[in-house]
Swiss-Prot record:
Species for this entry: Paecilomyces divaricatus
Keywords: Cell membrane, Membrane, Transmembrane, Transmembrane helix, Transport
Residue numbers spanned by region Disordered: 1-40
Similarity comment: family membership: Belongs to the major facilitator superfamily. Monocarboxylate porter (TC 2.A.1.13) family.
Main subcellular location: membrane
Protein name in UniProt: Agnestins efflux protein AgnL12
Biased composition (Polar residues): 1-10, 25-40
Task performed by this protein: Efflux pump that may be involved in the secretion of agnestins, dihydroxy-xanthone metabolites.
Membrane topology: Multi-pass membrane protein
């Protein structure tokens, strides 16, 4: 071997053993894959993906946010022989499937891309609604609305969120807030539309009309959402679940699990709370829309701030604020007080929901965005499954004060774990993290 050849080999060896960047840093999520993210984030292609993902959340989580209307209808007409707890399991299991299957859809997104998964999930969602429109028994409603529709959501929601994270690096939290705000808009529109339709047409045609509305919207999402060109020709990555050992990811998942145990209590019970005070039932119905309308801004504005001061910093602050507001729930006894509570809680809780994705994506390399979000959402699925029944069991003996304190305190406890995750990234209190 010549001297020049050996010298070249010696120069190449260190490069092959280069240590990868720390995935827990903010910068690593943008550069750890070895390629830079798009230089211009708000390109026509990126905006198209943003719009498609917005439509996904509007049709999926936004429709799920209207379950309170279904709960009331089932109790009064369709499933009057079933208890409130039995009916609430439909909504709880729907949330469990919606988040629980994301561990699978997240891995498949990283490996095969979002388009086929979103097309599959869209077909499952529409099929589930058509089957729901034909259902007359409790088990049929459970299989279609709770199980099948929830599984369909898991195959459209996470691929959309993970793909948006690939397009946006510096403005990731803002972008995520924009697409998640689609669920807030859906939470405003779907309850009003369903309530009107239930009063004017049959249950079957109400659900079928909802399916016909979703069909073109999800079709547009299937056409719009695709990975950046730089990922199109890359070899399919092997399964990499190393992020589950990351202490930051562990603290984040535990914290969000605790927060989500109490997060949706005001969404589900603010209407019945207002009616229990003797207020107008028609006005009480619109409180759910007030909470969702406020969360529309809560999912966008904090994301804009988080891109500048850090995702974990903002998530910790809004989690604490959500817990404090929830603890003050029963202090609102007038119509004006309940409206103010609904606005404040919607603003704070909306930020918690929109920042879970950016916080998860921040801890891993770009090729693992789907898996990381799937890990977090799997924890949320368990909270969604047991959270509503726990709330119902607390409400019976302890009333709305007990429900308020449980929701607020469990969210405050969850914020402690968010703080631990934040300090694991950077110990300084006044630094971006």
């Amino acid at each position: 071997m010549s001297r020049s050849t050996s010298t070249e080999l010696q120069q190449e060896l260190p490069a092959s053993k280069e240590v990868p960047p720390d995935p827990t840093s903010i910068a690593s999520s943008e550069t750890a894959s070895g390629s830079k993210p798009p230089s211009t984030e708000f390109t026509p292609r990126a905006i198209l993906v943003l719009v498609g993902s917005f439509l996904v959340t509007f049709c999926s989580v936004g429709f799920t946010n209207a379950f309170g209307v279904f709960q009331t209808y089932y109790q009064e007409a369709f499933l009057s022989d079933k208890s409130s707890s039995d009916i609430s399991w439909i909504g709880s299991f729907n949330i469990f499937c919606m988040f629980g299957c994301t561990f699978i859809s997240g891995y498949l997104t990283d490996r095969y891309g979002p388009r086929l998964l979103i097309c599959f999930g869209s077909l499952v969602m529409v099929f589930a609604l058509f089957m729901l429109s034909l259902s007359t028994e409790y088990y049929q409603i459970f299989l279609t609305q709770a199980f099948l529709f929830g599984v369909g959501i898991s195959f459209v929601l996470l691929p959309a969120m993970a793909t948006v994270s690939l397009y946006f690096a510096k403005s990731r939290s803002l972008a995520m807030g924009i697409i998640v705000s689609g669920s807030s808009l859906g939470g405003v529109i779907w309850p009003i539309a369903l309530d009107r339709l239930f009063n004017e047409v049959s249950f079957g045609w109400t659900v079928r009309i909802a399916a016909f509305i979703m069909l073109p919207l999800l079709g547009l999402a299937c056409l719009a959402i695709r990975r950046p060109a730089e990922f199109a020709n890359r070899p399919k990555p092997k399964a990499d679940f190393s992020c589950v050992k990351n202490p930051v990811m562990i603290f984040l998942a535990i914290g969000l699990f605790l927060i989500f145990l109490g997060l949706f209590s005001p969404f589900f019970y603010v209407t019945s709370y207002m009616i229990s005070l003797g207020k107008d039932s028609n006005l009480a119905f619109y409180m759910v829309s007030v909470v969702n309308a406020s969360s529309l801004f809560g999912r966008i504005l904090p994301g804009l701030i988080a891109d500048r001061v850090g995702n974990y910093n903002v998530l910790f602050m809004v989690a604490v604020f959500s817990g404090l507001v929830a603890c003050c729930w029963t202090k609102a006894t007038s119509v004006g007080g309940i409206v103010v509570f609904s606005l404040a809680y919607g603003l704070a809780s909306g930020a918690v929901i929109s920042l879970q994705g950016p916080c998860a994506a921040q801890t891993v390399q770009r090729e693992q965005f789907g898996v990381a979000m799937g890990v977090v959402m799997t924890f949320l699925s368990i909270a969604g499954l047991v959270g509503t029944p726990i709330n119902g069991q607390i409400l019976i003996p302890y009333g709305y004060l007990g429900l308020s304190l449980f929701s607020g305190l469990v969210m405050l406890l969850g914020s402690v774990f968010i703080l631990l995750a934040r300090l694991k990234i950077k110990t300084g209190l006044l630094v971006k993290a």
